Amino acid sequence: MIENKIKTQKFIVKYFTEIMIKGDRAKRQMLSQLLMNLQKISKDISNEIVLKKFFDKIELVTPLEFSSVLKEKLLQTPGIDQVLEAIQINEMDSLDKIKVEVNKYMSKEIADKTFVIRAKRVGTQDFKSIDIEQTVGGYMLAHNKTKGVDLRNAEVTIKLELEHNKLNIITQKHQGLGGFPLGSQGEILSLMSGGFDSTVASYLSIKRGLKTHFIFFNLGGIAHEIGVKQVSWYLWNKFASSHRVSFITIPFEDVVGQIFKDISPSYMGVMLKRLMIIAAQKVAKDMKIDALMTGESVAQVSSQTLRNLSLIDSASDILILRPLAMMSKPDIIEIATKIGTKKFAEAMPEYCGVISQHPVTAGSFDRVEKEAKNFDYTILEEAIKNAKIKNIDEVLDDVCEVGTLEVVNSVGENEIVVDIRQSSDILKASGEVLKIPFYDLKKEFKKLDSSKTYLLYCDKGVLSQLHGQYLKDEGKYTNIKVFRP
């Protein structure tokens, strides 16, 4: 770790390579969008963060106290290829000044190691980049105990960028998210179930620059709804917080009931998805959104055949994207693990509204049309009328309103605190404290002494309400409260 004696941290953002090969107009639009996104993200962290846009990069300078959170957000922002950490030193107008300053900050990094200096230069200096490399390298070699300079396989590479009289010493390089700036490629409505597939599909659309809204069809049970809201908020907050998007809930319990009445068993699954597409299409058109998205993958389950997907698509007259269409389940799970949605998916309450004992795998267009004519569409229209639209940044407040668990601020007799945070930290409180991460709570809670009352604890109380509701709705437990000391 470089000891930074300056009270600010500089980050240099390098644009995603695909942006740089676009035509001038498209490139200009994307880079302006990225700048606006970073301005919004930075302002949410601190008004003291300063941004400056260049033709090939964006520079951000932040007080050290905000550097870690800003770096994390930069690495999660679409449109960025690399994030460089740098120390900026001004008034570097001579080789003598440069060599002294570089040695001051980097001498500890090369102790007992081979090293090399790599420099880039912009400006009208009376020296070249190679002069910087040779001068700085020679000075550091003479003033430090090292294993020497190695031009090919150095253990430490010191990267310098000199812009006129401003020197950047690059101390760390991080791989960015890539993709296109959020909002530069239009808007899409993602059909969310909260499992592996829909969350990964939504992440991929966000990464590609699509402003991604979420729609959830509630087949029954509050636990599933609040779980999907939780993971949708997580995706938005982590990768897309520069834009406000919507979360739409459509009550589908009555639609499912009508399917059981009107549709043949083997076509129930296909018809359910067609009805979801019809409803989502109506919402998308009202919101001026051009496309829908699902997490379906060809042949992942027996009913997801090309024929069946075509039958589902025929219910829509707007574009339906399937980012996972050719991906295998292990690849999807790998991405879910990487982005942090795996544990949400594993902890998601299971609910199956329509179970086809013998689902059709190669459905008939004529048969689907016949089945569709049997369905009472007034039920679907009523469900769409009852849709609830929330801003994504408000859904957790909505969840807490739904929650009915008692909130307490002290530990009583016969009560045990359960710290459900994902981190390894454990709350210090009077009495016994158990550590059970939220994603293990459903499995582990049944093993606990049922004669005790358990106080669920997390940082803001939101996860406690969510997973307490899971246990209350799914397991019929009543010995649960939320702990807010």
Please report, for each region that a protein language model flagged, where it lies by residue:
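RNA-binding accessory domains that recognize and position tRNA/RNA substrates
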Residues: 1-189, 202-246, 314, 362-363, ...
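Mid-to-C-terminal catalytic subdomains of enzymes
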Residues: 46-49, 289-304, 313-315, 325, ...
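Active-site adenylate/phosphate-handling loop in enzymes that bind or generate adenylated species
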Residues: 135-140, 173-185, 239, 264-330, ...
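Residues at the starts of beta-strands that form the adenosine-phosphate
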Residues: 187, 211-214, 246, 290, ...
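Short glycine/serine/threonine-rich phosphate/pyrophosphate-binding segments
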Residues: 197-202, 464-466
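A conserved beta-strand->alpha-helix junction
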Residues: 233-262, 349, 354
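Positively charged, proline/Ser/Thr-rich regional signature most characteristic
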Residues: 407-454
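Catalytic cysteine-centered active loop of the rhodanese-like fold, especially the PTP/DSP P-loop
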Residues: 442-485
